[in-house]
Curated annotation (Swiss-Prot):
Protein name stated in the entry: Septation ring formation regulator EzrA
Coiled coil: 100-188, 317-364, 416-488
Taxonomic classification: Bacteria, Bacillati, Bacillota, Bacilli, Lactobacillales
Organism: Lactiplantibacillus plantarum (strain ATCC BAA-793 / NCIMB 8826 / WCFS1) (Lactobacillus plantarum)
InterPro entries tied to this protein: EzrA
GO CC list: plasma membrane; septin ring
Cytoplasmic side: 22-573
Keywords per UniProt: Cell cycle, Cell division, Cell membrane, Coiled coil, Membrane, Septation, Transmembrane, Transmembrane helix
Amino acid sequence: MQVAIGIVVVAIVIYAAVKGFQFYIDKQVRQLTERQQALVKQSQTTDFEKIEQLGLTGGSLAKLEALQSAGQEVDNDQLPAVSEQLTAITSQARGIRFLDAQQNLKKVAATLDTIEQRQAEIRQGLQALDDADAAHRQAVASLEKKYQNIRKTLLSQNFSFGPSIDKLEDQLANLESDFDHFSELAKAGDHDAAEKVLDQLHHDTGTLEMDIDRIPPIYKDLVSGFPDQLAELASGYQQLTAQHFHFEVESIEPEIKALQQAIDDNIALLGDLKVTDAENGNHAIEKRIDHLYDVMQAEIDAKAVVDQQQEEISKFLTHAMNQNHRLQIELDRLAQSYTLNNGEVERTRELNEQLKNIEAVYQADVTAITSKQAVFSEIAAHFAEQDEQLKGIEEEQVAINKGVASLTAEESKAHETLQRFDFEIHAIKRQVENLNLPGLPKDYLDYFKVVAKEIERLDHDINKLVINMDDITKQLIVIQADMATLKEKTSDLTDAAVMAEQLLQYANRYKTNHEEVQEASVEAQRLFTETHDYARSLEVIATAVDKVDPGSYKRIEDSYYANKQADKMNDEA
């Protein structure tokens, strides 16, 4: 019983599965059938007749025929074949050949995709043929009107084109001939061939229109603008030469003639329709004419500058030469008393030579002006250069004069400083002698003698017949530093000697009861009287006394410096 039930269940499951697959395939077939029917309707709406009525020929007709052939293949072969395949798939599903049915469904879907794409290409191809026909009809009307306007322009403005008119008319005639050929092809329906002719027509027509726009202004400059300017230049040149103007390069008249020839050459280029070459030639002519104007104007402007600056340069030059003469006299006087170390005399002579050269050029320019042979631009350049040179010379003269003007004052100050050094070293000597010391340390004596000899040398050099103030100044700087060091050494010597004496006296109270103080006193006394090492003597006795009486050295030291400061303040008061 259970086995029978199991068989029934399996049979039901298998039946349900078969029905499910059949339902799925039927659904897919219905969807694909709908697509196929839609494509059939779409194919029926494709308007081949409209394009056939255009009366195409040549390559355009071949394109139409190819599109018609493709459409017939879709309608007569491909779409009916899809219908048959869908019927076969339904039969396969009924016979439980589900795998075959599934694979064939995919093939049919792919075939429909291909048909859809092919139909789209056919529609696009037909539209392109229709568009080409419309565009060419429009081009025929547009170009015909354009050529009429061009011919009107050439007829009404033929004088504006000069020698170019004949070739412009020839080009227009050629374009009209090509246009007639294009019109014939377009009317005959051979739009492929017509399109090639149209492309060339557009290019050539654009070139002609550009030439028609560019030539009139070029020709106008050549027949009126430039000749008028050359006439003005020639007249201006004659007037300037009559007023005794001269130019750096006497090439204005030849250049005017050369420009007239350049104008003729450019007109010939226009006659050959070499418009770009003629345009470039006009730019070159314009620059050359502008240059001639600039040359003439430069001389006119330069004359105004020369008239204004001639007297100024003369006065400036005279002033500089007088200043240099006075400076040379002053340097000769100072050289009798001082050594001039910075080449002042030689530099002043060089300045004098520069002034002579400036004067020579200036006089030559004045002569040229007087004899009416002046090139004013050259003279104006000379004046500008001379003004800069004279300013530089004046600055150097001032610097030289400033450098030597203080020599006398520096000498006087050096004498005063020498006297102060002499007074100070004698004061130091008296200060040390008043200490009544048994002697002085050798290093101190040596340094004192060095400073004393430096002062003696300075005294000797400053009283020479010819003084080298640079050397005197260097000596003053050295002595100033050495004198400061000597004062410091003297102060240290005095402090050590006086405090050593005070501590030796103070130590007497401890010598009897303290043997170390007794020994230190003997050693300190020996250093004081025999070797004159007062600093060491102070150190020895101070160390010993501080051991038996801590703080005693500090008290004596503080008292000493307090008294020293009080004495200094009293002296200053």
